[in-house]
Design a protein with these regions (language model features):
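Short beta-strand elements in bilobed, periplasmic/extracellular small-molecule ligand-binding domains
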Residues: 31-33
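Conserved acid/base catalytic micro-environments in cytosolic active-site loops
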Residues: 2-8, 14-25, 29, 40-41, ...
């Protein structure tokens, strides 16, 4: 008999505890083992009840969500799914993802939500996925805020735009993207486009804070934006990104919502426009999206890289691409910045 997933619900609102508990336990594979009304009580119950997953509100008395996450990751690591109405607060959203929560879902409509049942299946699915993550790979990102003088020196190296770094990731992606761009030089002759699993409601606040803590200039992908060297464009997985050459012979982004395989669409369009000047990168995630797009990159003589499976929070996305034989290099997360830089440098020397 398969054991049920044990969940602890942490929220200061009695209504939300009841609603979340009822919708999760409507699935026969999930059992609510307890609840807590603030972070301090939640920590005590994590240690006593040993849940497989916790759902966590961010706005609570005694100990707020961010402080609670910090303590959880040090004292009693467990997968955390945030369910909060504070998605518009850039600092809180960013900090929660930086500290290593596996998912961040906005409450459907405010702190006391009467339509939370509309989100029932999504929350059930995310809790089930959280229960099988590799806990060893859940860790906080250590970042330093860049001052304006440092950013000017780093961001504006007057490089040409010769390459595209196209990055695809689903669940677990925001944390991994932060680590990558905190170490990757913005002086590479490239632009970067990232499609990742993050709620469109959260994305603007996340991008704003992301830009403050990495040397790259970071923007939300917008339709018609002309690609610039040293800029990272981030899009939600709910959008699709393609590339187009405009009347001024500039490469611009097209943002739409028509494809059910956003990563395949991203990689295929990148290959068609940039050809051998594209590096495709698959990071942590679930599903098989990206595999067909990687095949197109290889066909156009670009390079495909996958994060090493053992360093992924969710390895399934990468395993599918490796099994299909469309990955040129498998690289540990720590080695990704150096590998990407070396590939661009070696390609530039070959073409001189």
């Amino acid at each position: 008999m398969v054991e049920k997933i044990k969940v602890l619900v942490v929220d200061d609102a009695a209504f939300m505890i009841k609603a979340v508990s009822e919708l999760l336990e409507s699935d026969p594979g999930i059992k609510i083992v307890g609840n807590a009304r603030n972070g301090l009580e939640g920590l005590e119950k994590i240690k006593a009840l040993r849940p497989d997953v916790i759902t966590l509100d961010m706005d609570m008395p005694v100990m707020d969500g961010v402080t609670t996450i910090r303590h959880i990751m040090i004292e009693a690591p467990v997968p955390v799914v945030v369910l909060s109405s504070l998605f518009s607060d850039g600092g809180i959203t960013f900090e929660a993802l930086r500290l290593g929560v596996v998912d961040f879902l906005p409450k459907p409509s405010g702190a006391i939500s009467h339509d939370i049942h509309r989100a029932k299946q999504q929350l059930i699915d995310r809790v089930k996925l959280a229960a099988v993550v590799n806990l060893q790979n859940i860790r906080r990102v250590k970042l330093n805020r860049w001052n304006s003088r440092e950013l000017l020196a780093e961001r504006y190296g007057f490089q040409s735009l010769d390459y595209l770094l196209a990055i695809g990731t689903t669940l677990g992606g925001p944390n991994t993207s932060l680590r990558l761009f905190s170490s990757l030089s913005p002086k590479l002759p490239a632009a970067a486009v990232v499609v990742q699993e993050i709620s469109p409601k959260i994305l603007p606040a996340f991008v704003k804070k992301f830009d403050e803590f990495v040397p790259w200039k970071v923007e939300a992908a917008r339709d018609g934006a002309v690609l610039e060297q040293g800029v990272c464009y981030i899009s939600s997985y709910e959008n699709t990104i393609t590339f187009q050459i405009n009347s001024n012979r500039e490469i611009c982004l097209r943002v739409d919502t028509v494809s059910d395989k956003p990563l395949d669409t991203l990689f295929a369009s990148a290959a068609d426009v940039f050809e051998h000047h594209v590096i495709g990168l698959l990071l942590t995630g679930i599903g098989n999206d990206g595999t067909e797009g990687f095949a197109r990159i290889k066909k156009k003589s670009g390079v495909t890289i996958a994060q090493e499976v053992d360093t992924c929070v969710y390895p399934n996305l990468i395993q599918c691409a490796i099994e299909r034989g469309v990955v040129d290099r498998v690289v540990s997360e720590n080695e990704l910045p150096a590998t990407i830089a070396a590939l661009m440098e070696s390609a530039a020397h070959v073409e001189m």
